[in-house]
Each structure stands twice: as C-alpha cells, then as structure tokens.
C-alpha cells in the first residue's frame, strides 16, 4: 500500500467519526494495519488509551500489562526524555517495547517512539514495535501524522472534561442557592448524618434533633433532586434512601460550612 493510500485510510477513520470522539482502539487498529507494527497509545500517566497487535509477543508480563491497560511507571516516565521521534531502537535500548527478559527471542525487535504533543505540552507517547523490518520514512510520516491526530483528540477530551466540570459545579451552586436558610441547614445536617455519597436516613429523627419541621427536609431534598444533584427514594418506615449524583455537591457544601 502506497503512502497516499495509507494516509487516506487514516483520514477515512477521522471522517467517519464526523465530529464524534475518535476511538483510540480503532485508531490503533488502523495504524497497526497501515504501518504493520504493534501500536501502543500511552497517556502521560502510562494508561494504555489504545493498542493493536500486529505480531504477537508471548510474554506473561506483556499480557498482564495489556490486560490492565497500564504501562510500567518507570518506563512511562523515561519516555519523557524523548522529545522528538526516535526510530529503530533495538532491544538493548532502555526504550524497547519488547520484554527485556526475553532479549534472545526478540533480537530483531525494533521500537519507534513518537511524542504526542498538543497545546504546547506533552500529552502522551505513541510507541511502535515490530520484528525484523526497519521503520522507513513513510512509516515515520504516518506515525507523526497519527500522533498529531491523537494529540488533538486528547486536547478535545480535556476541554470537554473541563467544560463538564464547570457545568456540574454551576448546577450545584444554583441548586444550593435555591435553598432557604432553614433548608440549607437541614441539608447540612442530612449529609453529616449520611457521611458519604449514599445511604439511608430517617428524616423525622433529624427534624426532631435539629429542631426543624419534616416538611423543610422534604422540600430541601426535592429541590436538590429536581436539579439532578441527588436521587432520593422513600422506603416507608425504614426511612429515605439518598444518593449523590453530582460529585461536586459535597465539596461545595463543605466550602459553605468553612466560609
């Protein structure tokens, strides 16, 4: 397959995504096919975002690593020493993707490391490995193009996470601000009693202990539930089951108490 055809194959994957998140596993599969190498997309912390195997490596440690989708911490950190594409590293290199305990089996193993950079920061690493055949310029062009695409996708995901976090925080703040003074007091006592993100409590007992009416507790819970911050369900005589749905809620509630 010529370079242009291989590039088009990668482009076809991006176009088929049509604005949706690119699946790192599919991306790895396509890279594996066009570059004809084992492909590992590794995050900054060593998480295996995606991988595809062209040549099986029979090694228990490698199998466990793939099953756990996590690269060793020491190896992951060492990858940051590589700031530009390093190709055709042999099995004696500290950066080899082949198991060092089986060097004699993978004497012809070659590894190429491509930094994934976006927004001026290191986002991860693309690791390619194959036996025998050297990585040529065409392979490196495809690898660097792929790393750019992966970098853009990681940046997009990070931006979405930040946006979602801000939205969750805003929802919580609005829900809390909708509570009256007595309702807020009731909620503080409820979650002191709950001491976690979910559990069972008896509203009447809290009302009696704090000196507020049960209706205040019911109204407060209803407001938080309608905002999607919590889920509550009456279990009759047993009490009320409460579960926090928004992970920003308890943090914002704690901030109010310290102010």
Curated annotation (Swiss-Prot):
Its main location: cytoplasm. The modification Phosphoserine is found at residue 215. Disruption phenotype: Disruption of the gene results in strongly attenuated virulence in both mouse and guinea pig models of infection. Disruption leads to a delayed initiation of dissemination but similar kinetics of subsequent spread of the bacilli. The mutant cannot grow on heme iron as sole iron source. Disruption alters the expression of more than 200 genes, including the toxin genes. It also causes a decrease in AtxA protein accumulation but it does not affect its transcription or its translation. It does not affect either ex vivo or in vivo capsulation. Autophosphorylated on Ser-215. Autophosphorylation may regulate CodY activity. Pfam families: CodY, HTH_CodY. It is found in: Cytoplasm. GO terms for molecular function: DNA binding; DNA-binding transcription factor activity; GTP binding. Keywords: Activator, Cytoplasm, DNA-binding, GTP-binding, Nucleotide-binding, Phosphoprotein, Repressor, Transcription, Transcription regulation. It comes from the Bacteria. Monomer and homodimer. DNA-binding global transcriptional regulator which is involved in the adaptive response to starvation and acts by directly or indirectly controlling the expression of numerous genes in response to nutrient availability. During rapid exponential growth, CodY is highly active and represses genes whose products allow adaptation to nutrient depletion. In B.anthracis, CodY represses or activates directly or indirectly several hundred genes, including genes involved in amino acid biosynthesis and transport, as well as nucleic acid metabolism, the pentose pathway, the tricarboxylic acid cycle, acetyl coenzyme A synthesis and oxidative stress functions. Among others, represses directly the expression of sap and eag, encoding the two surface layer (S-layer) proteins, by binding directly to their promoter region. Binds to a 11-bp non-palindromic consensus DNA motif, the CodY-binding site. Belongs to the CodY family. NCBIfam families: codY_Gpos (TIGR02787), PRK04158.1 (NF003170). This is Global transcriptional regulator CodY. It comes from Bacillus anthracis. The gene is codY.
């Amino acid at each position: 397959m010529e370079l242009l055809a291989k590039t088009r194959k990668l482009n076809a994957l991006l176009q088929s995504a049509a604005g949706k998140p690119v699946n790192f596993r599919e991306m790895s599969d396509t890279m594996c096919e066009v570059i004809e190498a084992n492909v590992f997309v590794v995050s900054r912390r060593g998480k295996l975002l995606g991988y595809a195997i062209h040549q099986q490596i029979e090694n228990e440690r490698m199998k466990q690593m793939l099953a756990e989708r996590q690269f060793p911490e020491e190896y992951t950190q060492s990858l940051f020493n590589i700031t530009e594409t390093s190709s055709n590293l042999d099995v004696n290199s500290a950066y080899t993707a082949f198991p060092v305990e089986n060097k004699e089996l993978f004497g012809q193993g070659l590894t190429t490391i491509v930094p994934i950079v976006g927004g001026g920061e290191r986002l991860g690493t693309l690791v390619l490995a194959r036996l025998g055949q050297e990585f040529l310029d065409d392979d490196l062009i495809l690898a660097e193009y792929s790393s750019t695409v992966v970098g853009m996708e990681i940046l997009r995901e990070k931006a979405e996470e930040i946006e979602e976090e801000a939205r969750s925080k805003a929802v919580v703040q609005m829900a809390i601000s909708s509570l009256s003074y007595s309702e807020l007091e009731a909620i503080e006592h409820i979650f002191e009693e709950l001491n976690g993100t979910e559990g069972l409590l008896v509203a009447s007992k809290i009302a009696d202990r704090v000196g507020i009416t049960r209706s205040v507790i019911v109204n407060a819970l209803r407001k938080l539930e309608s905002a999607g911050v919590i889920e509550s369900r009456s279990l009759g005589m047993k009490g009320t089951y409460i579960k926090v749905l928004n992970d920003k809620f308890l943090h914002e509630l704690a901030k109010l108490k310290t102010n």
